[in-house]
């Protein structure tokens, strides 16, 4: 069990989160609003989740960008054991997808140089890759979450934490009354209507330094 941090004041709100690849607005809202966010290092890797995919808006609708992974043949693998695969030239494909989807958005060019390295450099482990992305996005969003990594699988009840590790997911998310998506400008809104809870990149590229006000 993760021990309660010694410097955590009584009554501090605690969120348990899984690792995400350019996670959704809802995930970053938790980072911004909770007094302490524990990022789970020891949960099992689950396919078709935000652990290795993000959702963006395109002219054809929502598109999933998925990072290919390598892991052992065991049925359940810890996130810390998941490796990033170089299969399929995915970095180039993901960057081109973002360029195609958001190249005409108000702030794509402003943030492009900060984000391009994630699609050029190689990372060995998915968790480390996602963590670096998270730190960079917090910097660009100008939020300073109290983010700590778990040293073993966390017991949400013992910590008095709100557990979002498997609640925030692309398919059949668990209802979250504390998250009410606030509409913001989107490039393809006239064609598809407002599409809520896409990757944080969608909010950043469309709203720039105003993005934090939607968190």
Per-segment meaning from a language model:
Residues 2-215:
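Residues lining hydrophobic/aromatic ligand-binding pockets adjacent to catalytic sites
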């Amino acid at each position: 069990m993760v021990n309660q941090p010694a410097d955590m004041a009584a009554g501090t709100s605690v969120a348990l989160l899984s690792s995400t690849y350019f996670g959704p607005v809802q995930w970053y809202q938790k980072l911004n609003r909770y007094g302490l966010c524990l990022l789970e290092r020891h949960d099992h890797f689950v396919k078709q989740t935000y652990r290795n995919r993000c959702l963006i808006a395109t002219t054809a609708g929502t598109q999933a960008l998925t990072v290919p992974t390598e892991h052992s043949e065991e049925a359940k693998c810890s996130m810390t054991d998941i490796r990033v695969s170089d299969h399929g030239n995915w970095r180039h494909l993901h960057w081109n997808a973002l360029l195609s989807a958001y190249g005409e958005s108000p702030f794509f060019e402003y943030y492009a140089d900060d984000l391009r390295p994630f699609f050029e450099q190689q990372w060995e482990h998915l968790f480390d890759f996602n963590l670096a992305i998270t730190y960079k996005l917090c910097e660009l969003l100008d939020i300073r979450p109290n983010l700590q990594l778990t040293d073993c699988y966390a017991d949400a009840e013992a910590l008095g934490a709100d557990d979002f590790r498997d609640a925030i997911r692309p398919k059949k998310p668990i209802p979250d009354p504390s998250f009410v998506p606030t509409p913001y400008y989107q490039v393809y809104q006239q064609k598809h209507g407002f599409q809520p809870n896409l990757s944080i990149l969608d909010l950043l590229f469309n709203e720039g330094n105003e993005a934090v006000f939607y968190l």
